[in-house]
Curated annotation (Swiss-Prot):
It comes from Mycobacterium leprae (strain TN). It catalyses: D-glyceraldehyde 3-phosphate + pyruvate + H(+) = 1-deoxy-D-xylulose 5-phosphate + CO2. Thiamine diphosphate binds at residues 71, 112-114, 145-146, 173, 284, 365. It is an enzyme of class 2 (transferase). One of its GO terms (biological process) is thiamine biosynthetic process. InterPro entries: Dxylulose-5-P_synthase, THDP-binding, Transketo_C/PFOR_II, Transketolase-like_Pyr-bd, Transketolase_BS, Transketolase_C, Transketolase_CS. This is 1-deoxy-D-xylulose-5-phosphate synthase. Its cofactor is Mg(2+); thiamine diphosphate. Binds 1 Mg(2+) ion per subunit.
Length: 643
């Protein structure tokens, strides 16, 4: 049946039984397609009936449907003409794992960061009103814990102020990645209890109505008591007191009930909340049995069992998790903070060991950072574990609440650099540029597991300002021993015997291994290369400047945007001490990159050892000639320059 659904209008003629059959078919397809590519399975299994109802009630794209945390949009894609493309999900040139304006007119925003849909909806509704299109509804689907984000409440405050037709669907599955934390979650949980409570009152009413006059009096008394109790217990007042109408709670897996609620909401003509209760992972036993995350995300797996098809190697997150627990066993002042992602950031095990020292603040990165500042003021050493892409959301708090006060807060930045298959919204290529302008900030980029443990310990020993440690997604690189350590810098390779100190190659973090491969290629061409890992990459340490003075060309190699990254910092530092060795930066052009594997993105950007070696050879030739010993001349223009 799904093959016959090419556009939302094709749903209109289906019977309720056909809709139930279609929902089952969609779930089966979701499991098999996501099992083959990896992706967000649990959230999409939970919104099948809801998405069917949305497209039967509203006229997309005339009525925009905006998915907050856009990983809930797989079913939406299936119903808007993209079902046949799911074999390419999250692959290069294939279907995005999030809404994509390039894919379909039904996708209004490239949504993937949480708590933004209501603000988009508010703006669209205002635009439609100004254009005289008040018959257009805007639907925002908010779920997976997004209401724990403060931006949602800022938007609700504005949406409620005017009678524009905004329908806010709260997809309440009680979870983000893990169970949703906080007062809003508790309020919604109370609302979920109300249907049973209402049914009990209905039975009491029927019994009392069967009695003579005394029954009518008793019913009126009970109804007045009920109203008082409900007013005191109903968290729907959170919404109605703002001026928003409220419909629900509704069983999110009863398509007809959801459709009735949505039609009712559509008829109001103003802002309304539709509270839909769903189960993440619905209909797939392995997901339902996953108590921790209900298979929020999965890699390639066996669709029958839900088990991964290959044994995962130790990754960066696991190494960090183990190291942090080790340090915390020795120091009671170490605490950890996560913004609704204890599992993905490696803090679940920490919480099991130290339940009173892990704080899950919900999807609230700004609050997480300022709360960390408060903990540091109270003589704790907080570790904020966060994805690089989400660190952007807390920049003001890092600057004004942490750094201004010189507080010892350690930020552990996971998924730094190119992450790949999740696309432009999840690449962590901005953090070095952002943190580089924060006064007093010290940033480390470990090249391997040994250095991660080592640099985490060093960060935890800092008591006079903020620190950050960044590492990428995926398996840990092989350990790379240093030949020696000089002024805080690890020297990983030196020119072969007989070659001059032509190039100083600065490998940042995991790019140290690429730097060694590049050096080998250059050595084979007679170019002498020293490879170093600065370890603490920002601010630029004296060891880098000392070595820069003795080489003829400096090249930095980093998985960050070239604007404002380590290369730019090295160039600035050289100018400040009047070292005129030319500097070239190899990194990521400041652009948004479509989803593909990490290796595919890097190859497309020319960030392979072969391509980088070729570029450096060109610079060496342009600047002069290389040679051995004293006959090696100084290269060309005597200035620091970033490319």
């Amino acid at each position: 049946m799904l093959e016959q659904i090419r556009r939302p209008a094709d749903l209109q003629h289906l019977s309720q039984q056909q809709l139930r059959d279609l929902a089952a078919e969609i779930r089966e397809l979701l499991v098999h397609k996501v099992a083959a590519t990896g992706g967000h399975l649990g959230p999409n299994l939970g919104v099948v009936e809801l998405t069917l109802a949305l497209h039967r009630v509203f006229d997309s794209p005339h009525d925009p449907i905006i998915f907050d945390t856009g990983h809930q949009a797989y079913v939406h894609k299936m119903l808007t003409g993209r079902c046949q493309d799911f074999d390419s999900l999250r692959k290069k040139a294939g279907l995005s794992g999030y809404p994509s304006r390039a894919e379909s007119e039904h996708d209004w925003v490239e949504s993937s960061h949480a708590s933004t849909a209501l603000s988009y909806a508010d703006g669209l509704a205002k635009a439609f009103e100004l254009a005289g299109n008040r018959n257009r509804h805007v639907v925002a689907v908010v779920g997976d814990g997004a209401l724990t984000g403060g931006m949602c409440w800022e938007a609700l405050n504005n949406i409620a102020a005017t009678p524009r037709p905004v329908v806010i669907v709260v997809n309440d599955n009680g979870r983000s990645y893990a169970p949703t934390i906080g007062g809003v979650a508790d309020h919604l949980a109370t609302l979920r209890l109300q249907p049973a409570y209402e049914r009990l009152l209905e039975k009491g009413r029927d019994a009392l109505h069967s009695l003579p006059l005394i029954g009518q009096i008793a019913y009126r008394f009970m109804h007045s008591v009920k109203a008082g109790i409900k007013d005191s217990l109903s968290p729907q007042l959170l919404f109605t007191d703002l001026g928003l109408k409220y419909v629900g709670p509704v069983d999110g897996h009863d398509e007809h009930a959801v459709e009735v609620a949505l039609r009712k909401a559509r008829g109001f003509g103003g802002p309304v909340i539709v509270h839909v209760v769903t189960r993440k992972g619905m209909g797939y036993p392995p997901a339902e049995a996953d108590q921790a995350e209900q298979m929020h995300t999965c890699g390639v797996m066996d669709p029958t069992t839900g088990q991964p098809t290959k044994i995962a190697a130790p990754d960066w997150t696991a190494i960090f998790s183990d190291a942090l627990i080790g340090y915390a066993m020795k120091r009671r002042d170490i605490v950890a903070i996560t913004a609704a992602m204890p599992g993905p950031t490696g803090l679940t095990a920490f919480g099991q060991c130290f339940p009173d020292r892990l704080f899950d603040v919900g999807i609230a990165e700004q609050h997480a950072m300022t709360s960390a500042a408060g903990l540091a003021m109270g003589r704790m050493h907080p570790v904020v574990a966060i994805y690089s892409t989400f660190l952007n959301r807390a920049f003001d708090q890092i600057m004004m609440d942490v750094a201004l006060h010189k507080l010892p807060v350690t930020m552990v930045i996971d998924r730094a650099g190119i992450t790949g298959s999740d696309g432009p919204s999840h690449n962590g290529m901005w953090d070095l540029s952002m943190l580089g302008i924060v006064p007093g900030m010290r940033v480390a980029a470990p090249r391997d597991a040994i250095r991660l443990r080592e640099e985490l310990g060093e960060a935890l020993d800092v008591d006079d300002g903020p620190t950050a440690i960044r590492f990428p997604k995926g398996d840990v690189c092989e350990d790379i021993p240093a030949l020696k350590r000089r002024s805080g810098v690890d020297v990983l390779a030196v020119p072969a015997t007989g070659l001059a100190q032509d190039v100083l190659l600065v490998g940042v973090g995991v790019f140290a291994s690429m730097a060694l491969a590049v050096a080998k290629r250059l050595h084979n061409q007679g170019i002498g290369v020293t490879v170093i890992d600065p370890r603490w990459v920002l601010p630029v340490c004296d060891g880098v400047l000392e070595l820069a003075h003795t080489h003829k060309l400096i090249v930095t190699l980093e998985d960050n945007g070239v604007n404002g990254g380590v290369g730019a910092a090295v160039s600035t530092a050289l100018r400040q001490v009047e070292i005129d060795t030319p500097c070239r930066d190899v990194g990521l052009p400041q652009e948004f990159y479509d989803h593909a594997s990490r290796s595919e993105v890097l190859a497309d950007l020319g960030l392979t050892d072969q391509d980088v070696a070729r570029r450096i050879t060109g610079w060496v030739v342009a600047f002069g000639h290389c040679g051995s010993g004293d006959d090696a001349g100084q290269y060309g223009p005597r200035s620091s320059q970033t490319m």
